[in-house]
From Swiss-Prot:
InterPro entries: ARFGAP/RecO, DNA_rep/recomb_RecO_N, RecO, RecO_C
Gene expressing this chain: recO
Protein name, entry field: DNA repair protein RecO
SUPFAM superfamilies documented for this protein: ArfGap/RecO-like zinc finger
Record's keyword terms, sorted: DNA damage, DNA recombination, DNA repair
Protein's GO biological process: DNA recombination; double-strand break repair
Any one of the GO CC terms: bacterial nucleoid
Gene3D superfamilies, alphabetized: Recombination protein O, C-terminal domain (1.20.1440.120)
Family according to the record: Belongs to the RecO family.
Role played: Involved in DNA repair and RecF pathway recombination.
Length: 238
């Protein structure tokens, strides 16, 4: 049994003295795991784009990867702590939450858009927020930010219900604002597929707090790593 495909490194961890357990995201096969030999010469890092060949006797076996790095992520992220933490966050989210062997080509393409913007030193906040929104929607927990859940109005949408993930207008939600989440304009625009200019650091931080709430609630309840890293990340942004 063998296949070959481009993939992005989602994570590695030691497996014995000479191997790593490697997690990669591919466009056509989704999240895949397998063993690969550890090398000090050019160690694999999260975000690396690799040409991966997987081999096993049976499809259900863990299997082994032979990898060639096509593009290293290190130089695009290591000088920017916020960018590096976002890369670490999204790879952790996807390697933890995505089911194995289930293709998510839209999610893969969105990751590549984020990586391209980050590596080109272009505005990338919106690309990252789109990624987290897609993780929720692809796994069945989409936020509905297109209209008010009560009145169906598309105007003055200022809140999100923490219970339903649906938008609420100012008129409907004002009396309950202490129990609701704020709705940043950038999240609504991205969710509705509307092109918008890159958000500010403050709006990015607010959006991360909101998406973090829903990711933690639906997909990462037991991930203390995610909770701690999200606190640090939003703290750095202000």
């Amino acid at each position: 049994m063998q296949w070959r495909e481009m993939g992005v490194v989602m994570g590695t961890r030691p497996y014995g003295d000479e191997h790593l357990l490697l997690s990669i995201l591919t466009r056509n096969r989704g999240l895949r795991r397998g063993l690969t030999r550890f090398t000090k010469k050019r160690p694999l890092q999260i975000g690396d784009l690799i040409d991966a060949t997987w081999r096993a006797k049976l499809p259900t076996n863990l299997g082994h990867f032979t990898c060639e790095v096509i593009a290293s992520a290190f130089y695009s992220y290591f000088r920017d702590r916020i960018k590096l933490m976002c890369l670490s966050s999204i790879t952790h989210i996807m390697s933890t939450a995505l089911p194995e062997n289930e293709p998510h080509p839209t999610l893969y393409d969105s990751f590549q858009d984020f990586a391209a913007a980050a590596e080109a030193e272009a505005p990338w906040y919106n690309h990252y927020l789109k990624l987290e929104l897609l993780v929720l929607s692809q796994l069945g927990f989409a936020l509905d930010l297109s209209k008010c859940a009560v009145s169906n109005s598309k105007d003055n949408l200022l809140f999100i219900s923490p219970k339903t993930g649906r938008a609420l207008s100012e008129a409907v939600g004002c009396a309950y604002r202490d129990k609701l989440l704020p709705l940043p304009k950038v999240l609504r625009s991205i969710s509705c597929g509307v092109e918008t200019e890159c958000c500010s650091a403050d709006e990015f931080a607010l959006s991360l707090r909101i998406l973090g709430f829903f990711l933690r609630r639906h997909l990462l309840q037991e991930s203390h790593t995610f909770q701690e890293s999200r606190k640090i990340l939003t703290g750095l942004l202000g």
